[in-house]
Regions:
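A short, ordered amphipathic alpha-helix with a cationic face
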Residues: 192-195, 223, 227
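Catalytic cores of RNA-modifying enzymes
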Residues: 1-210, 247-255, 262-268
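Conserved Class I S-adenosyl-L-methionine
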Residues: 179-181, 216-217, 221, 227-268
């Protein structure tokens, strides 16, 4: 019982359905037999997904696992994999130092840090061409939704700026131990062709966050709360944040940059 509580505290719900594990594994593209792609599994647990990844000849599998009990289990059951298993926190990992030539990411992501995992992927978008992750269903819906949806939000915009996102399939509660209280879903992110935005990218993040900070209000009011009064109007001001596409937010960011006095643009 204490071990189960510990897993819950880590946000971990271990997948027990082998067919779903195979399906998740097959959803990730790889390299070739001659040039296998590096793949990092985040949260290997007891190796339910790991075992199928290790069967592929087009990938070299690495793992990130923070739970000492799981690490010990994996060392005992997959000794050939053990040298590539990193005991530690994925969120603190130096991906560039370890995978300078790029790495695909996959995993049954702990619910309590799934959004943080996606933010880390955004930060390392030049290194991560693809990600397949199982997350809480509401998170999967949120990041895959187009503009105009109530679920569309900050993470939706920031991920869709750099990745094409597919909601692959829903996963029920009974295939986990311990069973979560919500449904899960698997999503796939594939790097799009955007290499840079036509605006200040740090300011873009600030504008997106400010816009959704009071998402029920018109953008005029949401932005004013962070940037102050511009003394001018933009055509998006009567709209709400959820109505704007990534391209719209790029346009709005450039307008904010052009209409703020030099040195007054918040960067934090």
């Amino acid at each position: 019982m204490d071990q189960v509580r510990a897993k819950k505290a880590l946000g971990q719900h271990f997948l027990t359905d082998l067919n779903i594990a195979r399906k998740i594994c097959a959803s990730l593209s790889g390299g070739t037999f001659e040039a296998p792609a590096a793949v990092l599994e985040v949260g290997c647990g007891m190796g339910v997904l790991t075992q199928f990844l290790l069967q592929r000849c087009d990938v070299v599998v690495y793992g990130a696992e923070i739970d000492a009990e799981s690490v010990e289990y994996l060392h005992g059951h997959y000794p050939d994999f053990a040298p590539r298993l990193i005991e530690g926190d994925f969120l603190k990992m130096d991906l560039r130092g370890r995978f300078g030539s790029g790495v695909r990411v996959i995993g049954n992501f702990p619910y309590n840090i799934s959004s943080q995992i996606f933010f880390k992927i955004i930060e390392n978008r030049d290194l991560v061409p693809e990600c397949v992750g199982m997350v809480q269903r509401e998170v999967a819906v949120r990041i895959a939704e187009p503009p105009g949806s109530r679920e569309y939000g900050i993470l939706s915009v920031l991920l869709q700026a750099w990745y094409d996102i597919e909601y692959l399939f829903t996963v029920g509660e009974k295939v986990f131990n311990p069973p979560p209280k919500v449904k899960s879903a698997v999503v796939r992110l594939r790097r799009n062709g955007v290499r840079s935005l036509d605006c200040d990218e740090q300011l873009f993040v600030k504008v997106v966050k400010a816009s959704f900070g009071q998402r029920r209000k018109m953008l005029r009011n949401s932005l004013r709360a962070v940037f102050g009064d511009f003394g001018a109007e933009h055509r998006f001001f009567p709209m709400r944040a959820e109505q704007l596409s990534v391209a719209d937010f790029v346009e709005l960011t450039q307008w904010v940059a052009d209409n703020m006095p030099d040195g007054d643009i918040p960067r934090g």
